[in-house]
Amino acid sequence: MKTISILAFLVLARLIEANDLFQVKTIIDYQDLYLHINPNNFQVKLSHSSTDVFEFDESSNKLFCAGTNDIITYNKENCPYLMKFADESSSSVLGWSLDRQTLRFDHDLYFCGTKPPYSLLADPSGSANCRKLNIFRTVLEPKVEKEEEEEEYDGEEDDDDESLTEFESSTDFPTMTDESTEVEPSTTTESAISTTETSKDEESSTTVESTTTPKTTTTTSADSVTTTSKSNESLTTTESNESSTTTESKDSSTTTDESTPESSTTETDKTETTIEEQEEESTTSSQSEETEGPSGGNVDSTVAMVISAMFQGDRVYFYSDDKYITLLNGDLATFKIDDGYLQVNNNKWVNVNIERLLELVDNQEDATQGWIINDEGIFLVQDGFYSDSVSFSACGHDSGYRVYLGEENGCEPLNQFRIMNIEEDEIDETETTESTKTTETTKTTGPAETTDSAESTDDSNESSAPPPTEDPSDIPSATTTDEATVDPSDEQSIAPTSEPIDESTESEEPNESVTVTGDTTTDTSEQGLTTFTTETTATVTDCEDGDDSCTPRTTIRSTVITTHCPIVTKTEVETIVTDLTITLTTCIDETICEATTFVVSTTVVTTTLTTHSVVTEYVSSAHEGDGSSTIANEDKHNDAIVTPQETVAPDTNSPDADQEQPDSVEPDNETTDAPINVEDDATALISDEDTTTSTITTLIYITQSGDQPIKTPVPIFDNAANLAGSISLSSGVLLLILMLI
């Protein structure tokens, strides 16, 4: 009797494939639950198992029970429960929407109850323990318990050869079978339905037809097309290249290659289409409900994955910096799902913190559980049931961009996600290649390396998605080096041979820096004169003996007139520094190599500003007077100012030298002149003896290189006999100066 039930299911499975029928499923509290219609009150429930199959009409956006005109909806006025209605007039006009495998109702739905089966309501008012349910998933094949026992056929055994058949397992539907149990699916021969299967081998074509009820067994024929499904492994279909599968029985029609062309062609096309669809879906294995969402597609969340998205107009990959999920900084992040936890780079776990930031934690129990990744996107089971696919956004940080869950935090949203499986060894090879390529700064263009064609074919057939390409905009290299720019004209063209060996070796030879001084440009400009006058004044009170009256008087000890005449010289020196030698060795084969040496030079232009400042000081003699006294002979003093443009030696042989006398010859014993500090660190020597009128000239060099001025005062004249300039003094003053010397 079990055999008849299984065959009935197979007939139903064929009808489902032919008419796009499906079951409806969701996940609540990490359990797969299916839409089930209560046969008593026609209410729609969510239960662990169901045989109800549905179909969707895109033109009317209605969900029908398969093979009937009964629709699934609710009555807005008197029945808030989701039910099956045979008469559309007694139901609401709300419909459904189907996007790929995502099924949504046009009104919010709630599931109520403490445990399955749950009731589905559009209005939970007055009901307890209700939670909102957003979306459903469609399952293209119904759920079937695996049969592991041998079932014997109730009837007489035929004397002829017995047919050996196997039942094919669903390739994309999660089952309740324990993970450690191995299930052996096989080719199925149906009763009362003529089927045709054609091998995809290009050399031969085999047609299998049967109209009898075969004996069921779990034995696998050695030459038959077999499909093996194991937990945590991808399904692989193996086809025999030499022999074909033939099922024969006593009452069956003859199985030959001479079937009618019309039926053979039609059935072959249908079968090949079905086989191709099954092979496309076979890359995803059935996983536990906690770790796998709706089945189907090419993404396997239990093996390494990389995730990319569009960000600011560019496709970027998810990275990690050992603390957070990031963009454009850190290392490439590979993801896996283990028991609903999202693992990163095999050593970290993703946790959504209170700020909704994707942070990385060391312990699995501290991470967020409920992640589901498949072809339809990234999902997070929150509050115990499915929600829409989650969205992500990125906010700028000091070290780059950090990824947040959701878009309500004001960050820039990410979209157009792509998820690709990648092998661990391919990740290692990719990282090694990236490191090698970033270390090389110069390489010779040559033919690309090719691998064995057989290995390439096997890799393309076994299929996992290719690793992300090394696009600088997508995956920035973690290693940076200083690259020397080489003129393309310096590269030597090497003709490739039949088996070229492209070996580029770059070495930096330590060498002393070579400095070459180039052109020197000097520009001199004169500035205007700057004059400063400094007076030293003292007040003296004279009192006579026996007289109480005292007379105050003012004495000008000295007057210093300082004149600056700066001359600025601008000098530009071009210096060429050779500080790097690069040797590039290119080998055509093991014996022929060529070495090319490149010298990298740096040109430095040094600008020096030099200021030649001629400082002339005029020191006057002391004068006495009352409180209103002023400098005597001020015009005479001004006439004695020496400028750099004038160079007149004093005339000591003048006939009037003996006749002219100074205004005050006697020294002022009460007055002592203090040393005078000259600006710009200049040094002036002024006698503190009987002070007379004198002139001191000092030359100051101020050299400025870059932004750091250097002041170096250089006294030019040591005494009055070496003064450079023009001195206009009376004969008596000149005689006194000569006597002092």
UniProtKB/Swiss-Prot annotation:
Residues 147-165, 423-432, 500-511, 657-671 have a biased composition (Acidic residues). It is found in: Cell membrane. This is Putative uncharacterized protein. Residues 720-741 form a propeptide. Induction: Up-regulated upon milbemycins A3 oxim derivative (A3Ox) treatment. GO terms for cellular component: plasma membrane; side of membrane. A lipid is attached at residue 719 (GPI-anchor amidated asparagine). The keyword Transport does not apply. Keywords: Cell membrane, Glycoprotein, GPI-anchor, Lipoprotein, Membrane, Signal. It is a lipid-anchor; GPI-anchor. Residues 142-300, 423-528, 646-681 are annotated as: Disordered. Glycans are attached at residues 232, 241, 461, 511, 669. It comes from Candida albicans (strain SC5314 / ATCC MYA-2876) (Yeast). Residues 183-197, 205-266, 433-451, 512-528 have a biased composition (Low complexity). Its main location: membrane. Residues 646-656 have a biased composition (Polar residues).
